[in-house]
Structures are given as C-alpha cells and as structure tokens.
Amino acid sequence: MTDPIAPLTSKDINTAKSAANEDAIVAQMRTFIDALKKHNYAYYVLDNPILEDSEYDQLRRSLLELEEEYPDLIQPDSPINQVGDMPLSAFTQVTHDIPMLSLGNVFEYDDLRDFMRRVNDRLSVAQQSPEYEMELKLDGLAVSLKYAYGKFVQAVTRGDGQTGEDITQNAKTIRNLPLWIPAASDIELLEVRGEVLMPKAGFERLNRLAEEKGDKTFANPRNAAAGSLRQLDPAIAASRPLAFYCYSVNQGLPEHIKTQSAALAWLKTIGFTVSAVEVVQNPREAQAYYESVKETRGDLPFEIDGMVIKVNSLALQQQLGFLSREPRWATAYKFPAETVMTRLHAIEWQVGRTGAITPVGKLEPVKVGGVTVSNVTLHNFGEIQRLDVRAGDMVSVHRAGDVIPKVTRVWTDQRPENSEPVKLPSTCPVCDSPVVLPKDEALARCTGGLFCPAQQVEALIHFVSRRAMDIDGLGASWLISFFEHGLVKTVADIYQLHNHQEELITLEKLGEKSVQNILSAIEASKQTTLARFIYALGIRGVGETTAQNLAQQFGDLDALMSASIEKLLLTPDVGAITAELTYKFFRAPHNIEVINALREAGVHWDKVEQVASEGLPLDGQTWVITGALDSMARDEAKAKLQALGAKVSGSISAKTTALLAGDKAGSKMAKAEKLGVKVVGEEEFLVLVGE
C-alpha cells in the first residue's frame, strides 16, 4: 500500500504558480528575442528589413521592460546585451592559441592549376586528386571568437598573425554574432574565425549620415568595419551596421565532421552566418564557379575581392601543413584589377623625408576596386613625361588588391585645347629651396635638408615608426601637432617631451592619460638595437636590411660614423651611392649633434655580436634568399647562412654566389639564371646547414 499523497500547502501552491509564471515570462522573452534576431539578420546581413523601425523599437522596448522587471530571467543571447559597454582606455594584446595566417594569392587560371598541382605533388601518389571547397573572399577584418561551454567570451583581431587586440566588448555589439550557442554548451572551448564586415547599403547609410553632420566619411566598407571595431567606446561600434561571417572552426569541432564544407554547414546550424559554398573537383570546375561569382558579385550585399579555395578534407589539410606565413592547402583567387576612367584636375608636388619631390595627381573622386580614389601617385617627373599626363586630362586609373592606384593611360584625344605640359618646379613647394634633378636619378630633390619643414616632419614620423624606434602611440598627427607648437624640431627633441608635460596635456584632445602613455612609450624606446637606431636616423639609401648589415659589419656606432667610403663598400648591399650618402651623413655637424643628443638622452643598445667569418665554410660568399621556405622563416635561414660566414644580400648581382630559392620564387630566380648565379633548393640548403 502506497503512502497517501500529502495535501498541498498554500506555500506549495504559490511556488507552483510562480514556476508557471516564470515559464510564461521566459516563453514571452524567447518570442521577442527570436523576432529581434530574425530582424537583425535580415537588416544587418541581408539588408532586407522585415520590420518597420517603429515595430522594431516596440519589440525591443517590450523585451527591455520584461528584463528590467525580471532580471533573474534574462536570457544569455538577448539582443539587449548588444548595445555597448563602458568605454575602454586601451585594447589588450592577446597571443593567438593558433596563429592566424594569411593566404597566398593566385590571379590567373594557370596560377590556379599550379596551386592544385602543388597540392597533388605533396600528397601520396596513391591518393586521388582531392576535392576543393570554394568560398567568397570577404573584404573585412579577420577576427577570432571564443566560446566557453556555448557562451561568448572573447574576440581578438588577426593583428600580425601571432598577436592581436582584444575587441570583445565591441564584438558583442554585432547584431548577428551569437552571444550564446545552446548547441555548443557541452564544448569546453569553441574557437571560430571569420570576417567582420559592413554591408554595402549600411556603409552608404553611415557615410550619408556623416556627410549630413559634416563628419569625415569612410573610404570603403572595409575601412569602416575596421575603424568601428577599433573604437574604445563600444557604444560607437554598436551604432555601426556590422555583420560577422564565419569561415572556419579552429578548436572544438565535433569529431564526426571531416570536411571544410561540412564544418561550415555545422556552423550555420548552430547559429553563425556563413557565405556561399561550392565543392569542386578540378581547376576547370573551380574556374567556372569563379567566373559565375565574378559576373554576379555586384548583386551581393557586401564587398568581395575574390574567392578562397581550400582542400575540402580536414585530414588532408593537416597532412599538407603550412608554409611559414600561409597554409599549403588554401589560396585566394583574386579578381582582376579594376580600371576606370576619371578626370585628373591638377598635379601637386609633395616633399618626402629625404627631400624627394613626388608628383601627386588630384582626381575627380572615383570608385576603383571598392575604394574611392581621389589622389594617385605619378611617381616622378620622368613618369609624367612618359605618360605625357597633364592637368585636365581624362585618365585610366588601375588598382589591384591593396596595391596603390596608378594611372595607366592618358586619353589624349579628350585633352582640353588649352592644356600645357607639366614643368618640374624649380623651388621646393614647402621651403622655396632650389630643386635639383641629380644625374642618373629619377627623383628630383629639395636641397633644403632639415631646414625644410616637410623633411623635418617626415624624419620625425620615420624615426618613431614600428620598424625604427617603435614608439607606440606617437603617430603622425601628434608629431605634426608637436612640431607646429614648437615642441619638437629634431628627433632628439622627442626625448625631451617629458619636460613639456603640462603643455602636452593642454593640446586639443590629448588628456593626461594619453600624455603619460606617450611618455612611457618614449622611455621604453630608449632600449633598442644598433640596427634599428641606424635605420631610424633616416640615412638616404639605408633601408632595414642595409641597416642590419651595417650594424653587423661595424658592430659599433662610433666605428660606423668614422668609417671611410672604402670600408663602407665592404658591407653587403652597400654600393657606391649609398656608401657616399652614409659617409656624408655622419660628417654633417647637425647630424652629429642630434646623435650625441640622443645618446645623452639615454638611447642605448646591447653590444652587437659580430660573426667572425674567417675560416667558416661560406666565408667570402654572398647569398640571396627568395620565395617561401617550408622548414623555417626566411629570417631564420638568413641567420643560419650568416652563422656559416656568408653575407646575405637583398638583391641579385653578378657578385652573388648563390640564390636560395623556396616556393613561389619570382623574378630573382629569372635574374639568377640570366646571370649564371647558382640556384640552391631547400633540401640542398638543409644539408648545407646540417639539418
């Protein structure tokens, strides 16, 4: 006999009513959330709103009222959470668990076939040619997202591939980015990667509003997306029409999924937006799909700049592995460069860091390859003469990928009757010093030197740049402002800015915290390397590689400063012109004064460990490296050659002993063959260095 059922108390009845009421409230919340998410997808991704603004606002208000009344019942994926958090003071740097590598590029059908052939060659002969998966190459900002047991916890930009910026608070505001994934609630860590982009219609709306307010507009959707994600105030990012498209799973993929296409299908089922996918078997099918997308890409709601082609099998991807900067199993098939016609209204002359006078064409603004172009470099006076380009001409402007736009043709049949040939200015447009065009040089130059304000400012900008003294946060705009306010004239003055802290704080938009950050970065930059310091000085003809070679050759700044032209010529990559320019630089009283001031300010570096090449296997040899190596980065290969006594140069000449050629060796290979320079493959190189 079972025990009789105990009678319900009034407390039990109230608890039951409360539970039922909670279920009803949650159900109502879910109805609002699902409707809002559906609208957000239609609006921000498809650009096809399904609700009027007033209907959307009413839905949102209804959900917000419920959440304010029942905060304990707020759902983890509520769109109310996507409105922006407190502003940040700075972005945190995060190291990627798995590097975010870039892709190699192909531009023609023959390149595509070569890519697939290389894939086949690397796979076992017993295997059939693999199938490939093709995706749209979205033109946005690459980011990595992490979810812990289904909850969104972190977003990081690609950065340099190894380290990116934590943009979690901004990413939370992206309307189609899921904050909670029920289907992934049992996955300890899910990492997905994709592109944050701005749909074309949203971009046009954003720029239209900016124009109405008199604010600066964005050049293209990609810049707008990147700029939105890098706002310290998440509320600004929340106001921008951003969308996230997922293209890979890097951690947490269920084991039963074996292909890239299946991975994207799974991502779609759990709540992510993915682009169109096509599986192909060979180059011919890949080309057909590429052509079809190229013809219809204008109908897409977002910008793309090509296709991405991946080996579909995840196991084969693992087998094929990676080069130092890109996977062997994937490549980008870029769309051809776009060429458009527009009018060139004027030609202006700019002055660079070394006094180079460069002509810049001012165009009627025109969209080329997704970017609005209003300026175009004309390189030098010789190029102007070659093109016979004049103010008022109709010109063809060409742009491929991220390459700087250039004029490829002048339509002389449409030239105005009153046009006149362009003349090289006789005086500097900034300081009025005489302009000279040295014999055997393409660039005209201002003779004003550091008397010329333009050269002074450009020298300052170069000095603080990432590959020089790397003074983080001290950008061009601040340097120009400091220069105009008389706080800096030479690079040595940068290290005296701590004496002007109050003046810096009073400058427009530069608060106490920003000033402190800049001063801290300046202080940190005092510990550098001799090679960086030499490069930062901005000696004409001395790039990064030459600066490294000079540091290694002389080992000491004083030895370099006192070196004769004959001794300078013993340095790899230093020819007669660079040797003479370097020699003269270190004998100019002003330059010596600046260098002494930098040292007195505390700029220093560790002693250079010079490699004694005498008696080493490659002593007296000069090598050049080209292409991508499978086994190591090129810098590592360079170090191994130097350890054996070789000099490593950046250019091929008759004096070159050997060319180390990796994958995708380009014009240097052809030049080596023409000059009869020995070409060494990677396997032979590894034997040479004992690996």
Swiss-Prot record:
Keyword set includes Metal-binding: yes
Domain of life: Bacteria
Domain BRCT: 613-691
MF (Gene Ontology): DNA ligase (NAD+) activity; metal ion binding
Pfam families xref list: BRCT (PF00533), DNA_ligase_aden (PF01653), DNA_ligase_OB (PF03120), DNA_ligase_ZBD (PF03119), HHH_2 (PF12826), Nlig-Ia (PF22745)
Reaction catalysed by this enzyme: NAD(+) + (deoxyribonucleotide)n-3'-hydroxyl + 5'-phospho-(deoxyribonucleotide)m = (deoxyribonucleotide)n+m + AMP + beta-nicotinamide D-nucleotide
Ligand binding (Zn(2+)): 428, 431, 446, 452
Main EC class the enzyme belongs to: ligase
InterPro entries listed in its UniProt record: BRCT_dom (IPR001357), BRCT_dom_sf (IPR036420), DisA/LigA_HHH (IPR041663), DNA_ligase (IPR001679), DNA_ligase_AS (IPR018239), DNA_ligase_CS (IPR033136), DNAligase_adenylation (IPR013839), DNAligase_N (IPR013840)
Enzyme Commission number(s): 6.5.1.2
GO biological process, one term: DNA replication
Keyword entries, A-Z: DNA damage, DNA repair, DNA replication, Ligase, Magnesium, Manganese, Metal-binding, NAD, Zinc
Positions that bind NAD(+): 53-57, 102-103, 135, 158, 195, 310, 334
GO cellular component: cytosol
Required co-factors: Mg(2+); Mn(2+)
Family (UniProt): Belongs to the NAD-dependent DNA ligase family. LigA subfamily.
Function, as annotated: DNA ligase that catalyzes the formation of phosphodiester linkages between 5'-phosphoryl and 3'-hydroxyl groups in double-stranded DNA using NAD as a coenzyme and as the energy source for the reaction. It is essential for DNA replication and repair of damaged DNA.
Protein known as: DNA ligase
Source species taxonomy: Bacteria, Pseudomonadati, Pseudomonadota, Gammaproteobacteria, Moraxellales
